[in-house]
Every structure is written in structure tokens, then in C-alpha cells.
Amino acid sequence: MAFDLLKDINKKVHFIGIGGVSMSGLAAVLLNAGYKVSGSDSKESEITNRLKEEGAKIYIGHSKDNLQDVDVVVYTAAIPSDNPEIIKAKEDNLILMDRAEFLGQIMKGHKFNVAVAGTHGKTTTTSMISHVALSADLDPTILVGGDLDIIHGNFRVGNSEYFITEACEYKQSFLRFFPYVGIILNIDADHLDFYKDINHIKDTFKQFVKLIPNDGYIIGNADDKKVMEVLEVAKCNVLTYGINNGDIQARNIEFNEKGCATFDVFRNEEKLLSLSLNVPGMHNVSNSLSAVCLAEIFNINADAIVSGLSSFGGAHKRFEYKGTKNDITVIDDYAHHPVEIKATLSTAKKMNHNKIVCVFQPHTYTRTKTLFNDFVKCFDDCDELVLMDIYAAREKDLGEINSDQLGDAIRAHGVKCTNVHSHEEALEYVNANLSKGDLLLTVGAGDVVKVGELFLN
């Protein structure tokens, strides 16, 4: 495997934030190819220990002294410009690259790059596709945005021309990629701390489509009008899917008591196969159809598709079963956008339960402010909402928005909602208000999962 950028240097690469989900996968790919890798992170973790075992030099904490005999420094968007290692790299005139650009360089070393894009469902769909590719013995390299049991983590290094990765639109990251197959699951307003409006987002997705070579493919969700609008700029092959529209469709859909679907897959009027999923929700029927589209492109047979998709039980933090206590079921979900929350609650509603209690932690002030009205209306399917303070992530609190304001609006909308200001307060509510047969959902991209863990323990 060759990287254009690294051809003429001594192959010593340092990752700032090497313990992160995306960075660790890149580091593993390099280690496997024989490069010397070092990296720093704020804390030790399973990921840093795994990389250390594979030969990486790991530093805990950030310091100028960590850049020992290094040629290239890779960083993520989350690393501030005053990070001492960034400053040192600039002082020493080292090659400094952000994660997306570096991932693009790695993709150049593969022929069949699959980039999974969309506002929602990237991790789940990338995981589904990975299951199918492994079932078909394609021996792919995989980078996924969450832990996947079949690859024992968030990355897998293969020895073939196949490379499967998520393609995030935040700060136009995916425009640094070299996809042979692009997949667009859906397009909604998000990351409005960067994008001006939905048209800005659509224009960026159009640029993503234009990256694909003429002999490549774009796969798009035909049930999403914005996706179909974006696909109009395609010069490559186009394949669409949907529940109600598209080249590849799901028909005769039935759900079991866990909310998981069994259905037939058709291409035009030809039945291709029948599928039974092990992940719940109509949105996962849709996601699975994109995997069938990819299988069609790579001539993967029906047995491998069925085997791959039926063996997928979900990615971590995606409607993940955490446990049961006193006949109360606890499920954790990463949903942090109103469209995702609606899908999660709709899925929960199909399960056997008495009442659904949702503990939600809003993620970032910008998202909460810009999508405020959508957040107000997205909790109609839960019986009781426990609303935590906003999780700041990369942002500072400018005093423009808070969870109490959101709670007032949700209550005015008619949903039973209680504001809490700590995990312990949320736990008190759960202990006092849930009973046998209830469903506890912890929802959000921050650390709301702790509420369910505290309850179970």
C-alpha cells in the first residue's frame, strides 16, 4: 500500500488524539503497513493499549517533547490551535495534516473505496456493509465510528483493494476523500455552527458526488427528496433504493415483537432475496437496502448478503441493549438530532413495554438553538421525558440557550417533561418513577449513558 505523501520520507507519523475512534483506525492501518507510529492522548484507554501492543509509541498527555523524530503530524478538528504539539510541529516545519486529509491519502492506496455519507445512520450502515463485505470474504479495511463486535473494535486492517469508511460532512471533511462508491443515506440540517443553511449543506453533498470517477457509483436514498436533488449532478453510475421508491426496494415488511423487520428485496420487479434483520426500526430497513445496492455493484451473492445482514446485531450506542433490572429494560442510543430521536422513539414504541421514559441530554448549544423548534416536537412518542443540561462538547456557553428553556417549550407542546441538572438527579427520577415493564431510554451523544449504567448497577 502506498501513500503519495509518504513516499519520500522515513514514514514516522504522530497522531494527536490517537485514542479517538477515527484516529486510532488510521494509526492501525499505518502500523500494519510497516510505518513507525507515535501518538498522544489525554488519557489511557483500551484503544491506546491496543495500539501500544501493535507497536505504537503512546504518550499520555500533550507535550512538545512527544514529537521525537517525527515527519508527519496528524490532528483532528477537536484539537485546539494552541495545543503544544501543534505549535511544535509548526516550529519544526513538519508536515501537518488534519484527519480527513490524511484519510484521503490512505484511500489513494486502495482501488475500491466505499464512503458512507449522510446526516444520520452512518455508523450503523457502515457496520452493516462491513458485515456483508466480510461475509463475502472481500477482506476489507474498515474504519467505523463506533465499536463493532465482529471486528473487536472500531477498525480492521485488510489486505485487499476494498476500503470501507464513514464520510462525515462536518466542516466538509469528506471532500478530502477519494470514493469509488459513495452512499448518501439522507440529508438534514445539522452542524449549523459551520454550515449557513440547508442549501449550503446540499451544495457540499453535490461536491461529494462530483468526487466519484465516471466509472464509479453513487448510491442514494430515493425516499429523501434532498438526496435525489443532490444526485442530479452525478456524472458516475447512479443506483437508488427506498421503502417506497428507487431501483432497489423493500416490500412485504413485517415487524416482530422486538421491532425487527422481515421483508423481501426487489430490483424493479425482480425479487432478489428475503431478509430478516436483527436491528429494530424502519430506518434500518432503509439502511440495509443501501448495503444490498453495494452488494449488487460488487457482485456479492445473495447468501453472503443474507448472512452478513442477519448476523448484524447493531453497533455500540446505536439502540444498544444495556441490561434489565426489576423488569425495566435499559437501552442507550447516540441520537442527538431531532430526526434521529424521532426514529429511535418510533422504534422503541414497536417494542413490548408499559411506558417509555426517555432521558435526553442535548448535544452542543449551537444544535439546540438552531433546531430548537424541531427538538420541541420530536418527543411525542415517549410517555415521560427527563431533560438534562446541554452537553457542551467543543463549544463554550454564550448564555443564549439552556435546557430549562427547551423544557418549558416541550411542556407547552404537551409532553410530560422534567428538567434535571445532574446524572444523580436523573437517576433519582428514574428510581422514583419507573416500574415493572417500563422502557428506559438514554439518548444523546454526550455522557447520558451513565444514567442507565447507574440505574443498572
From Swiss-Prot:
InterPro entries: Mur-like_cat_sf, Mur_ligase_C, Mur_ligase_C_dom_sf, Mur_ligase_cen, Mur_ligase_N, MurCDEF_pg_biosynth, UDP-N-AcMur_Ala_ligase_MurC. Its main location: cytoplasm. SUPFAM superfamilies: MurCD N-terminal domain, MurD-like peptide ligases, catalytic domain, MurD-like peptide ligases, peptide-binding domain. It is found in: Cytoplasm. It comes from the Bacteria. GO terms for biological process: cell division; cell wall organization; peptidoglycan biosynthetic process; regulation of cell shape. Belongs to the MurCDEF family. Cell wall formation. This is UDP-N-acetylmuramate--L-alanine ligase. It comes from Clostridium perfringens (strain SM101 / Type A).
